[in-house]
A protein has these predicted regions:
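Bacterial N-terminal signal peptides that target proteins for export
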Residues: 11-23
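C-terminal functional modules
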Residues: 333-375
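An acidic, Gly/Ser/Thr/Pro-rich helix-cap/linker signature
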Residues: 37-152, 158-161
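Aromatic (phenylalanine/tyrosine) cluster motif
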Residues: 2-3, 8, 28, 52
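Acidic/His-rich structured neighborhood in mature extracellular/periplasmic domains
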Residues: 125-271
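Sec-exported extracytoplasmic/periplasmic mature domains
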Residues: 82-91, 101-108, 162-165, 176-183, ...
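C-terminal motif of bacterial Sec signal peptides marking the signal peptidase cleavage site
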Residues: 30-33
Length: 375
C-alpha cells in the first residue's frame, strides 16, 4: 500500500512500503495520499498534541505565474501527462505546466530506487537476518515513544477499533515502523519525488505517473499547494506513509473537520484502520502463532497456504490457538542459531498488504504488542 523511501522507511525490506503502494494525489499539491474530497477551501488543521509532529501544508493553493523553465519544462512526456490531466480531471493546462515546471529532478532518488530493487540472492544458512531487522524497531526508546503516542491518542485509537475492528496495537505498530509516530515522515518534496520517478524512471514510470496524477488531484481537492508537501523519496506521505493512490482509496477525515490530512495523527489513525478493514482484517482473530517443530523442506512465506492438519502431520504444532482457521501460511524467521516457524493467519496477511514483507509484518505486530505490554 505504501512506498517507503525516507530515512526510517528505507530500513524496510520489499519496496512497497515501498511499493505496494503508498500515498495520494490531487490537482496541484504533490504530497501525501488522500482520497478525493469536496471542493477546496481554507482548512484549519488542529495542532498535534504534545511533541508529536504535524506537518501541515498550507491549505490555499498558490501557483507561480509564468514559469517556463525547469527540469520538467518543455518535455514531451510531461505535455502528454498534462493533456491527460486536462481531459480526465479538468485541470488548466497552462497552470499545471507552471506547477510541473517548478518540480526538480534528483538523480539520488533514482539511485535509491535502484538500490531497493529486489534481489534473488538467498542465504546458504541462518545468519540472524530476523534478529537484525527486529532490532531496528523494537528498542526500549522506541517502545516508550509508542507508549507515549498511545496514551496521547487513546480515545482516537479506541474509536478506530470500534468503527473498523482493528486493535490499537496494530495501528500503533504500523505508525511506529513507518515514521516512528511522526518523527521521521520524510523531507523530500512529494512533487519532486513523483515527477522524477514518473518522467525519468522508465522501469516504474507507469506506477509513479499514476501516483503523480493522484497526488495532484489530492492537493487540488484538499486546497493544498502542490509544491509544499514533503514525504519519502518515493512519494509516501504522512504518519502512515500512504502513497497518493492509497489516500484516494482509504484515507478518512477521522477528526471530522472537513479535510483529510495524513500529516495529522488523528486522520492517520482512522486511515490506517480503514486500510486494514478494507484488506480483510478479522476482528478478534489472532495474527500469527509460533510453531513447535522444524519443516526445512517446506516452501515458506506469507503467500504460502497449508492445511493446518498437514503441517501437524509433518511435525509442526501450534503453541497457542489458531482461532477458527484450518489453513495458514508457513512463516520462517532466521534467528541466527536456526529458524523459527510460525503459522501466518489472515490478519498477518492483511499487514503484508501494507508492505509485502514477512519481516515487515512481523515487526509491526511485535512492536505493537511490545508497546501494549509496556503501557
Amino acid at each position: 500500500m505504501f512506498y517507503h523511501g525516507g530515512t526510517f522507511i528505507s530500513l524496510l525490506e520489499n519496496p512497497m512500503r515501498r511499493l505496494a503502494s503508498l500515498l495520494t494525489l490531487s490537482l496541484f499539491p504533490l504530497l501525501g495520499g488522500c482520497s478525493s474530497t469536496p471542493a477546496a477551501k481554507p482548512v484549519v488543521v488542529p495542532q498535534p498534541k504534545s511533541a508529536f509532529i504535524n506537518q501541515t501544508p498550507s491549505r490555499s493553493p498558490v501557483y507561480s505565474q509564468g514559469v517556463s523553465k525547469g527540469d520538467f519544462a518543455n518535455r514531451t512526456n510531461v505535455d502528454r501527462f498534462v493533456q491527460k490531466m486536462v481531459e480526465k480531471h479538468g485541470f488548466d493546462s497552462a497552470q499545471l505546466h507552471q506547477v510541473l515546471a517548478q518540480a526538480e529532478r534528483y538523480d539520488w532518488i533514482i539511485r535509491l530506487m535502484d538500490a531497493q530493487a529486489p534481489t534473488t540472492a538467498k542465504p546458504t544458512g541462518p545468519t540472524g537476518a530476523w534478529n537484525r531487522y527486529r532490532a531496528k524497531f523494537i528498542t526500549p526508546d522506541n517502545v516508550q515513544n509508542g507508549v507515549n503516542f498511545w496514551r496521547e491518542y487513546a480515545s482516537e485509537l479506541n474509536r478506530a477499533e470500534q468503527i473498523y475492528g482493528v486493535p490499537p496495537e496494530i495501528i500503533v505498530g504500523i505508525i511506529g515502523v513507518e515514521t516512528r509516530w511522526g518523527r521521521v515522515m520524510g523531507k523530500t518534496r512529494i512533487l519532486d519525488a513523483l515527477a522524477t520517478l514518473a518522467f525519468d524512471y522508465p522501469r516504474r514510470a507507469e506506477f509513479f505517473t499514476s501516483e503523480l496524477e493522484a497526488f495532484l488531484v489530492m492537493t487540488r481537492d484538499e486546497g493544498m499547494d502542490p509544491t509544499e508537501p514533503k514525504g519519502s523519496y518515493a512519494g509516501a506521505m504522512g504518519y502512515g506513509q500512504f502513497m497518493p493512490s492509497s489516500f484516494q482509496r482509504y484515507a478518512v477525515d477521522f477528526d471530522g473537520n472537513g479535510h483529510t490530512n495524513l500529516w495529522d495523527p488523528v486522520d492517520a489513525i482512522g486511515s490506517v484502520a480503514n486500510y486494514f478493514k478494507a484488506h480483510g482484517w478479522e476482528k478478534g482473530q489472532p495474527v500469527a502463532v509460533r510453531g513447535q517443530g522444524q519443516l526445512p523442506g517446506y516452501e515458506h512465506g506469507f503467500q504460502t497456504r497449508y492445511p493446518v492438519a498437514s503441517l501437524r502431520r509433518a511435525g509442526l504444532t501450534p503453541t497457542s490457538s489458531l482461532g477458527n482457521h484450518s489453513e495458514a501460511s508457513l512463516l520462517r524467521l532466521d534467528v541466527g542459531t536456526g529458524y523459527q516457524y510460525w503459522y501466518g493467519l489472515p490478519n498477518f496477511y492483511a499487514i503484508t498488504r501494507y508492505n509485502h514483507s514477512t519481516h515487515y509484518a512481523m515487526a509491526v505486530w511485535q512492536l505493537g504488542l511490545a508497546v501494549k505490554a509496556a503501557r
